[in-house]
Amino acid sequence: MEKEGLGLEITELRLGLPGRDVAEKMMKKRAFTEMNMTSSGSNSDQCESGVVSSGGDAEKVNDSPAAKSQVVGWPPVCSYRKKNSCKEASTTKVGLGYVKVSMDGVPYLRKMDLGSSQGYDDLAFALDKLFGFRGIGVALKDGDNCEYVTIYEDKDGDWMLAGDVPWGMFLESCKRLRIMKRSDATGFGLQPRGVDE
């Protein structure tokens, strides 16, 4: 099948950058004698200058402007550099993000943005709105007289009472919030209601 007569040069698949026309003589396999002729001269100098000798005549390889300009996406950016460039932007807001919030007796989890709250009072108001329950704000302010207690998991995996540390430290270390019944919250330094020391 002859390609020249059918005009299939445009649709021919080639290995190389798009928009670069390479002489058809260079695309075909070369015979041993042609390889010896090109290697007899300083082949690397001729290739760098764009002059290719084959059989004694010299011809200039055409480089189109598209081939000279940088191809989009080349050179490939290492995934390590991509991840680190994203981390630099996110490290300015350390700890500010969405955390999971669970409540005892509620069969679903919620997520909330801690960065939107300005302090523990705003957090209590947001949690009240989130679960439609009016006891969470009281639990954060006056934990002794409430049925529920708000605890959080810090970076180390320890569960601590919300409100015991300054707000900035809470934002940096909070990974998860849990609103649990006071009777179930053993081991947090809490006593059941009505029990005096």
UniProtKB/Swiss-Prot annotation:
Mutagenesis or variant effect for residue 76 to S: In msg2-1; gain of function. Affects auxin-related developmental processes
Assigned keywords, A-Z: Auxin signaling pathway, Nucleus, Repressor, Transcription, Transcription regulation
Domain PB1: 96-184
Alphabetical GO biological process terms: auxin-activated signaling pathway; response to auxin; stamen filament development
Chain ranges for the short sequence motif EAR-like (transcriptional repression) as given in the UniProt record: 13-17
Subcellular localization, as worded in the UniProt entry: Nucleus
Record InterPro entries: AUX/IAA_dom, AUX_IAA, PB1-like
Family the UniProt entry places it in: Belongs to the Aux/IAA family.
Protein name: Auxin-responsive protein IAA19
Gene encoding the protein: IAA19
